[in-house]
From Swiss-Prot:
Alphabetized UniProt keyword annotations: Activator, Bacterial flagellum biogenesis, Cytoplasm, Disulfide bond, DNA-binding, Transcription, Transcription regulation
Compartment annotation: Cytoplasm
Lineage: Bacteria, Pseudomonadati, Pseudomonadota, Betaproteobacteria, Burkholderiales
Species per Swiss-Prot/TrEMBL record: Bordetella pertussis (strain Tohama I / ATCC BAA-589 / NCTC 13251)
Family named by the database record: Belongs to the FlhD family.
Gene Ontology CC terms, in alphabetical order: cytoplasm
A Pfam family of this chain: FlhD
BP GO terms, sorted: bacterial-type flagellum assembly; positive regulation of DNA-templated transcription; regulation of bacterial-type flagellum assembly
Recorded domain comment: The C-terminal region contains a putative helix-turn-helix (HTH) motif, suggesting that this region may bind DNA.
Principal subcellular localisation of the protein: cytoplasm
Subunit structure: Homodimer; disulfide-linked. Forms a heterohexamer composed of two FlhC and four FlhD subunits. Each FlhC binds a FlhD dimer, forming a heterotrimer, and a hexamer assembles by dimerization of two heterotrimers.
Listed name of the protein: Flagellar transcriptional regulator FlhD
Gene for this chain: flhD
GO terms, molecular function: DNA binding
Entry-linked Gene3D superfamilies: Flagellar transcriptional activator FlhD (1.10.4000.10)
Length: 107
């Protein structure tokens, strides 16, 4: 395996672990708000909350990113990047657009 590939895999694993740890911490602090912010269903949130540190590390060692870029629609991405509506109104618009997205389900 090339050094660049090894470095990329290490970076992916680091991002995965950081994401899983952050998600667990968010869910412990405010379960309902975190489910909304993360786009998780109850089932996904419950499973993530029950994972031990060893299970988190094992899951993080995937060669694929575990987090998903949720801004896959132009109106949402532009609402977050263009200062057309101004501060609070722009943030509210982005929140409404995010709320319309379905939560992730276990397939």
């Amino acid at each position: 395996m090339k050094t660049a590939d090894s470095s990329l895999l290490a970076d992916i694993r680091e991002v995965n672990l950081s994401y899983l740890l952050l998600a667990q911490r968010m869910l412990r602090d405010d379960y309902a708000a975190s489910m909304f912010r993360l786009g998780f269903s109850n089932e996904v949130a419950d499973i993530l909350m029950r994972l031990s540190p060893a299970q988190l590390v094992k899951l993080a060692n995937s060669s694929s990113l575990l987090c998903r870029f949720r801004f896959d629609d132009y109106s949402l991405l532009s609402a977050l990047t263009q200062d057309v509506l101004g501060g609070a109104l722009q943030q509210a618009h982005a929140t409404i657009l995010l709320a319309r997205q379905p939560v992730e389900e276990l397939a």
